[in-house]
């Protein structure tokens, strides 16, 4: 058994054997002593192991095809956008690994991503799902709330605070996260002509975003809000943070059509009406010069080299979104009904009626939940108090004419139509 003191009665460290005179401090435990030097050594060993673990987080980056397949489980359609994002994200985290190893002098520059498409087509969901696949912190910001530093509104650094909070204030983890900035088209320059009035929510925000998009050591106020000289800041390096910007870019289709139209002049040119092409097909032809004409500044466009467009969702796509993904809306409501002991059946014509209503409202997939909730609210109010019902059938009439659903009762085993 290890002795706690030497022949002269002096206390000594149970690990390295140094006496109390040879070290600064001895910490006592039940039948054991440890010196400050051994504590420091233990801390270094633990820190090394933690660093190794954090490096291992990206040692097995999913390949583009694997990322694509996982995205397919959650997102219907948008094949080209999913492919482009899978490659871009794979290359980004390969670059992060390469930077960590620093085996050569070749510096791979970061490729941030721009997603174009109408509202409700899956831009936000794509970014969220990517962060989930890679198990990295994720933060979302709305570009419309941002203003240039010194003006009323949010500073761009507050975006980074959301990411740090998502990483439970682990800055090192946050530095490998993903940030999605929505409605980036709303910070386009209001006019091509310079004005006496400062554009603090347009070009000013683009200028403020440049630094964090490219990579900088940013000072973030830990409580958010505006900076002031006497507060402490969290320092975060944005070099390895992947920024995904999204926007509807209303009107850019006309800019693209004007550019393409000029090439269709002359004898023998193929004449094609702009009306023959859908919005998704037009957006797929976007070039950086179109973004410049729309109002993004050249430096900003240069920081987002990966540009991908998303298609508007038609009736068939919306029906698939209702039933096919792992967390599909219909599956969620079936689970809610199942908890009350009731089977929920949504007929095909009812699903198509929901999809048509979403198209009429111009809300895309984002509006599907509100429509379903609106039409199922009354029956979800009544069912918990109806002990004899085991099945609820939603028909087209329930959606289009606000009729009551068809209920199957335990004691009769046949369909009964409930009148209002």
UniProtKB/Swiss-Prot annotation:
GO terms for cellular component: HslUV protease complex. Residues 1-54 form the ClpX-type ZB domain. GO terms for biological process: cell division; proteolysis involved in protein catabolic process. Zn(2+) binds at residues 13, 16, 35, 38. PROSITE patterns: CLPX_ZB. The keyword Cytoplasm does not apply. Component of the ClpX-ClpP complex. Forms a hexameric ring that, in the presence of ATP, binds to fourteen ClpP subunits assembled into a disk-like structure with a central cavity, resembling the structure of eukaryotic proteasomes. This is ATP-dependent Clp protease ATP-binding subunit ClpX.
């Amino acid at each position: 058994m290890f002795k706690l003191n030497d022949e002269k009665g002096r206390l000594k460290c149970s690990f390295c054997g140094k006496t109390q005179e040879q070290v600064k401090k001895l910490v006592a435990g039940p039948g054991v002593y440890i010196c400050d030097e051994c504590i420091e050594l233990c801390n270094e060993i633990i820190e090394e192991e933690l660093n190794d673990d954090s490096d291992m987080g990206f040692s097995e980056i999913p390949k583009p095809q694997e990322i694509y397949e996982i995205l397919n489980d959650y997102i219907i359609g948008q094949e080209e956008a999913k492919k482009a994002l899978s490659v871009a994200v794979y290359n980004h985290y390969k670059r992060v690994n390469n930077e960590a190893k620093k085996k050569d002098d070749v510096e791979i520059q970061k490729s941030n991503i721009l997603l174009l498409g109408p509202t409700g087509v899956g831009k936000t969901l794509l970014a969220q799902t990517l962060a989930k696949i890679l198990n990295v912190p994720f933060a979302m910001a709305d570009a419309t709330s941002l203003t240039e530093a010194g003006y009323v509104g949010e500073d761009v650094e507050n975006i980074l605070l959301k990411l740090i909070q998502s990483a439970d204030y682990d800055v090192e983890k946050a530095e490998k996260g993903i940030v999605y900035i929505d409605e980036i088209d709303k910070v386009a320059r209001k006019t091509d002509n310079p004005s006496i009035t400062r554009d603090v929510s347009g070009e000013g925000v683009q200028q403020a975003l440049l630094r964090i998009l490219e990579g900088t050591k940013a000072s973030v106020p830990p409580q958010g809000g505006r900076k002031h000289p006497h507060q402490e800041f969290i320092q975060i390096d944005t070099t390895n943070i992947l920024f995904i910007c999204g926007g509807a870019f209303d009107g850019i289709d006309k800019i693209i059509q004007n550019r393409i139209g000029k090439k269709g002049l002359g004898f023998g040119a193929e004449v094609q009406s702009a009306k023959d092409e859908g919005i998704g097909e037009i957006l797929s032809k976007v070039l950086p010069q179109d973004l410049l004409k729309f109002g993004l500044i050249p430096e900003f466009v240069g920081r987002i080299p990966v540009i991908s467009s998303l298609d508007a969702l038609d009736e068939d796509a919306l029906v698939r979104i209702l039933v096919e993904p792992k967390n599909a809306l219909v599956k969620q409501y079936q689970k809610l009904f199942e908890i009350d002991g009731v089977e929920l059946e949504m007929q095909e014509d009812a699903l198509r009626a929901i999809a048509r209503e979403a198209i009429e409202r111009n809300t895309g997939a984002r509006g599907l939940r509100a429509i379903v909730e609106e039409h199922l609210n009354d029956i979800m109010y009544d069912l918990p108090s109806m002990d004899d019902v085991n099945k609820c059938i939603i028909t087209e009439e329930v959606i289009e004419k606000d009729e009551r659903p068809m209920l199957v009762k335990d004691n009769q085993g046949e369909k009964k139509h409930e009148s209002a």
